[in-house]
């Protein structure tokens, strides 16, 4: 039997934290990862980020906003290619996630801004986008999708293992030798970022300094945790805007930040009750791993050492973009992206729309 073809894939991710666009290159056959290539990021300009925030929670696509966003992705690919001496022809496939503005799986609706056909024209390379739509259309949650990549990454690690991605929304992947279970745990950084932006004009709590000075308000925490989402068994997914920071309006900035950190970490900790067995190791990826208060509280609540994914040699800033490079190849090969135990679909299924340049 001939060896499987190894593809050079470039993945693009702009997450619910709204901080910018990540681009990463990997080489993969769609099953295993052969090598990691370059990674670059492009922060959103504050004015553009503000316009994206205004688009959150709406079902309408602004053609102008989508076009601008797509051009930004093309610019990042060009910057990465130039910096790392990568020829356009070296890239076999581009995985383009786009920017989620609305996610309502209960209504079989999910929307990611980003024009795949336009990106294919701008780059001259085939592009796969719209990764979540097929899953949602048949009643799946459409998220999380990265677990199939987490499983490939964790092949040589001691299992069972939990990989937590703390972006705007937090999700967890439970991986053992014969099981893959994944679901959103609750808010990640989104509420903390929204709080800091509303009260200070800054985009996040640098090094968790505000939360470190505050005290948790137990009544607000109880209020957050009483949400129906936490009563649901997995698989389940969460829209970035499912919760509102108005619950913390009466609190000082520091106490509100501490309460929101407690909310994120308590929700992640409670997720372990759904695992089929205890895990040997907790690894954290996403922006939340840079917040010392989140990492400290997570370790304390779990009663285990929680480490960033860099401790096992991965790049936590690149993983989400790498995941969509990996999924682009799987989509090309008609391999599954989602499973009954990750999104609730009735059977494993692929997804994504392929666009070729003219």
PLM region spans:
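Short glycine-aspartate micro-motif
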Residues: 9-13, 90-95, 161-165, 182
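Glycine-rich phosphate-binding/hydrolytic loop that grips phosphoryl groups
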Residues: 14, 18, 262, 310-358
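Glycine-rich phosphate-binding loop plus the immediately following alpha-helix
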Residues: 21-24, 36-54, 128-155, 162-231
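Short glycine-rich phosphate-binding loop at a beta-alpha junction
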Residues: 87-97, 277-288
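A contiguous, well-structured pocket-lining segment that forms one wall/lid of small-molecule binding clefts
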Residues: 202-281, 292-303
């Amino acid at each position: 039997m001939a060896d499987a073809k190894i593809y050079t894939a470039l993945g693009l991710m702009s997450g619910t934290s709204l901080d910018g666009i990540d681009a990463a290159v990997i080489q993969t056959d769609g099953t295993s990862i052969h090598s990691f290539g370059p990674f670059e990021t492009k922060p959103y300009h504050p004015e553009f980020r503000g316009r994206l925030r205004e688009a959150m929670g709406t079902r309408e696509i602004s053609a102008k906003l989508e076009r601008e966003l797509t051009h930004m992705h093309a610019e990042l690919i060009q910057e990465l290619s130039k910096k790392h001496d990568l020829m356009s022809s070296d890239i076999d496939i581009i995985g383009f996630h786009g920017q989620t503005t609305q996610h309502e799986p209960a209504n079989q609706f999910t929307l990611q801004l980003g024009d795949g056909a336009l990106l294919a024209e701008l780059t001259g390379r085939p592009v796969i986008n719209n990764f979540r739509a097929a899953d949602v259309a048949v009643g799946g949650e459409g998220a999380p999708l990265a677990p199939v990549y987490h499983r490939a990454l964790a092949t040589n690690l001691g299992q069972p293992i939990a990989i937590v991605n703390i972006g705007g929304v937090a999700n967890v992947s439970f991986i053992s030798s014969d099981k893959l279970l994944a679901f959103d745990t609750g808010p990640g950084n989104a509420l903390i970022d929204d709080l800091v932006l509303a009260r200070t004009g800054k985009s996040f709590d640098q090094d968790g300094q505000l939360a470190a000075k505050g005290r948790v308000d137990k009544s607000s925490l109880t209020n957050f945790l009483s949400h129906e989402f936490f009563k649901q068994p997995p698989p389940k997914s969460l829209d970035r805007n499912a919760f509102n920071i108005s619950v913390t309006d009466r609190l000082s900035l520091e106490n509100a930040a501490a309460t929101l950190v407690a909310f994120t970490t308590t929700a992640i900790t409670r997720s372990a009750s759904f695992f089929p067995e205890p895990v040997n190791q907790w690894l954290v990826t996403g922006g939340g791993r840079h917040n010392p208060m989140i990492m400290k509280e997570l370790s304390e609540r779990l009663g285990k050492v929680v480490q960033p994914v860099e401790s096992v040699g991965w790049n936590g800033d690149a993983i989400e973009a790498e995941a969509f490079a990996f999924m682009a190849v799987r989509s090309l090969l008609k391999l599954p992206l989602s499973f009954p135990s990750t999104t609730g679909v009735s059977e494993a299924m692929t997804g994504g729309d392929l666009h070729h340049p003219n």
